[in-house]
Amino acid sequence: MSQAAQAGAYISRLSEKHDVDPFGVVALLSLTALSEVDFTKVAFWREVSDVMAGRA
């Protein structure tokens, strides 16, 4: 599976698990990347950071 396909599948799983629109997930990921706020204190973002770091 390509990296783009993996990212798409992951965004889909996150949107279903947390009942968030997939475009909202992408927008929030973009906001997180541009922000200095520590989102790792929120469970949703801990999961995102774990996946991005290869821990999940």
Language-model features, listed with the residues they occupy:
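N-terminal acidic leader/helix
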Residues: 1-22
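Short, charge-rich amphipathic interface segments used for partner binding and complex assembly
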Residues: 24-56
